[in-house]
Amino acid sequence: MLVNAKEMLDKARAGKYAVGQFNINNLEWTKAVLLTAQELNSPVILGVSEGAGKYMTGFETVSAMVAAMDKSLGITVPVALHLDHGTYEGCYKCIKAGFTSIMFDGSHFAIDENIAKTTELVSVAHGLGLSIEAEVGSIGGEEDGVIGRGECADPDECKMIADLGVDFLAAGI
């Protein structure tokens, strides 16, 4: 059952339990995560990077695969399909493809541009019943061949982005 991530995380907060996000890269990983979540009776967030989406021939393919597997495997636990660290353009592709949650990584933009793009995406996502995460500062690590040092987010900038109505905030620490 595909749901937006905010709904499941609100229930988790009220019930005092955690929800895992697992990035998927192919059919086998997706099947393993879905079956394990079902076996454990645990909601789950399936994260998809832009690189993984490209590898799996596009976000529409990913969305169709997850929806078909959810149905054919008889998954009854809540499942969110979430774009992980997406570009502005990637967010729109995932919205069109049927994802239930997006993450806009505007951390590389000046704060004014990050705010403008995040504001627009919050309006579109919420208008369609999707959850949205935004980033301030940069999270260190390597993904899709890009290595980031990480950068501490300015607390005032975090508040500015949070006040836009995002459902989750990723703050570089």
Annotate each PLM feature.
Residues 19-23, 81-82, 103:
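Short catalytic-loop micro-motif centered on adjacent basic/acidic residues
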Residues 3-14, 26-52, 57-76, 85-173:
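Alpha/beta enzyme core
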